[in-house]
Swiss-Prot record:
It comes from European mountain ash ringspot-associated virus (isolate Sorbus aucuparia). This is Nucleoprotein. The gene is N. GO terms for cellular component: helical viral capsid; host cell cytoplasm; ribonucleoprotein complex; viral nucleocapsid. Encapsidates the genome, protecting it from nucleases. The encapsidated genomic RNA is termed the nucleocapsid (NC) and serves as template for viral transcription and replication. GO terms for molecular function: RNA binding. Its main location: virion.
Length: 314
């Protein structure tokens, strides 16, 4: 039987020697970094102790300087948009026509980034997709564009607006010369809550209605309450929380009132709870009869009645 030689034992000295050989020598001025699987060394040439006093280095890499420019979120650019600046700039039929096809407008703005939307013979909105900030008055986001058009209609159909200095709604004096909106133009969003085209608030139900807060605070709050109470009728996804529904209007309220120091309940009291309640009732008076689901129920009831009539004739 062949004798298998035993492996030579490694002495303590040889182990320490191999460890020393595996160590990477590191100078005080060195910095090791990885490029793929390879370790590279950059040596800083100007040192004071273990502090590099400049970026001058053995690889001649020019580092540049990262500027002190803090990210401040929403405060980077102040939103100068004021719905009141757009009073009287839109023709009611032009505005109503665009709002009747708001979904198509949204899709075109998203696809093309920029769309021109003439709201009168002399005023054209430039609608920009995902607009963050601008000081150009007629350059607006999709939601702001819809609010501007809604505002120019509501001024004529309601003949009033909220006056924050008086804390009340005041007449605009347009009743005798108020423009009439073409009744054949359909606001499909208002149709979701079965709001009559004859209602002065027919064009309140638009994307971006929250931007109307400075002119119609009770109306915008009531509209938000409708969305919260009738989310399925308004085709809102189940994933959208009540706080999500309120967030856009809350931003407009905060801009005017500073909610850090003012209480939302006091603001509601200032505007008038009765005003909000009346508007909520106006917007929801026919809502139970609206929508595809209720039409299906009505049809089913008629069909059941028809079946019963067959029984009486046989």
């Amino acid at each position: 039987m062949p004798i298998i030689p035993k492996p030579k034992s490694q002495t303590k000295g040889s182990v320490e020697s191999s460890k020393k050989e595996s160590r990477v020598k590191m100078e005080t001025s060195d910095a090791k970094y990885m490029v793929g699987n390879e370790v590279k060394t950059i040596k800083f040439l100007d040192m004071r102790g273990n502090i590099a006093t400049s970026a001058r280095n053995s690889l001649n890499i020019s580092p540049g300087v990262f500027a002190v420019n803090p990210f401040l979120g929403e405060t980077l650019a102040e939103d100068t948009f004021n719905i009141l600046d757009y009073a009287g700039l839109g023709n009611v039929d032009a505005c109503a026509s665009h709002l009747s096809r708001s979904q198509e407008l949204r899709e075109q703005v998203t696809e093309k980034t920029l769309r021109e939307v003439p709201i009168s013979d002399s005023y054209v909105l430039k609608v920009v997709s995902n607009l963050q900030a601008t000081t150009v008055q007629n350059v607006v986001s999709f939601n702001k564009a819809c609010a501007v058009m809604s505002f120019n209609i509501l001024r004529h159909t309601t003949d009033e607006m909220y006056d924050w200095t008086k804390n009340e709604y005041v007449s605009l004096g347009l009743k005798e010369k108020a423009a009439k909106v073409n009744p054949n133009i359909i606001n499909r969003l208002a149709g979701q809550i079965n709001l009559s085209p004859q209602s002065p608030y027919y064009y309140l139900v638009t994307p971006g209605y929250e931007f109307l807060y400075d002119a119609y605070p009770a109306e915008t709050i009531a509209m938000t309450l409708v969305k919260m109470a009738y989310r399925k009728t308004m085709n809102l996804p189940d994933s959208m929380k009540d706080s999500d529904i309120c967030s856009s209007l809350n931003a407009k309220i905060n801009k005017r009132h500073n909610l850090a120091v003012n209480n939302i309940d006091d603001i509601i009291k200032q505007i008038g709870k009765k005003h909000i309640e009346d508007m909520y009732n106006t917007l929801t008076q026919n809502i139970a009869m609206s929508g595809k689901e209720s039409r299906n129920v009505e049809t089913a009831q008629s069909f059941l009645a028809l079946i019963e009539s067959f029984k009486t004739t046989t």
